[in-house]
Amino acid sequence: MSRKNRAPKREVLPDPLYNSKLVTRLINRVMLDGKRGTATSIVYGAFEQIKEATGTDALEVFETAMENIMPVLEVRARRVGGSNYQVPVEVRPERRTTLGLRWLVTIARLRGEHTMQDRLAKEIMDAANNTGAAVKKREDTHRMAEANRAFAHFRW
């Protein structure tokens, strides 16, 4: 792999049903072994369940959930004078979205419901209501950053 240039970021096309790039990124996150059709049916099925359960637009619920999951601060390890410090830093917008989607899908996979469609739908609804393990993950990340606030001056 060439180390000359950084690989350019490819543009993500919006999905055909909701016309949203965020939904496409969710589908890509859910996808395993290149099975996009399976991933698409899981995500769209979960959105149908959300629409039936809440009676509101599933995309709005999903966007609210993402806002509640995406972290604002995180800690990064920084070596200063022979010891490592956990330095709190702000999260870039692109990384916020990436972390939010990663946490959502990872935690949905660990849930106990029968199908991935059910797990994803329940986790998105929980996150939209500011409950659930994905929101707890964000709170833990923020708590860690707050606890290490004394090392903020090591930011680079």
Swiss-Prot record:
Keywords: Ribonucleoprotein, Ribosomal protein, RNA-binding, rRNA-binding, tRNA-binding. One of its GO terms (biological process) is translation. GO terms for cellular component: small ribosomal subunit. Pfam families: Ribosomal_S7 (PF00177). InterPro entries: Ribosomal_uS7, Ribosomal_uS7_bac/org-type, Ribosomal_uS7_CS, Ribosomal_uS7_dom, Ribosomal_uS7_dom_sf. The keyword Ribosomal protein applies. GO terms for molecular function: rRNA binding; structural constituent of ribosome; tRNA binding. The keyword tRNA-binding applies. It comes from the Bacteria. One of the primary rRNA binding proteins, it binds directly to 16S rRNA where it nucleates assembly of the head domain of the 30S subunit. Is located at the subunit interface close to the decoding center, probably blocks exit of the E-site tRNA. Belongs to the universal ribosomal protein uS7 family. Part of the 30S ribosomal subunit. Contacts proteins S9 and S11. This is Small ribosomal subunit protein uS7. It comes from Streptococcus gordonii (strain Challis / ATCC 35105 / BCRC 15272 / CH1 / DL1 / V288). The lineage of its organism: Bacteria, Bacillati, Bacillota, Bacilli, Lactobacillales. The gene is rpsG.
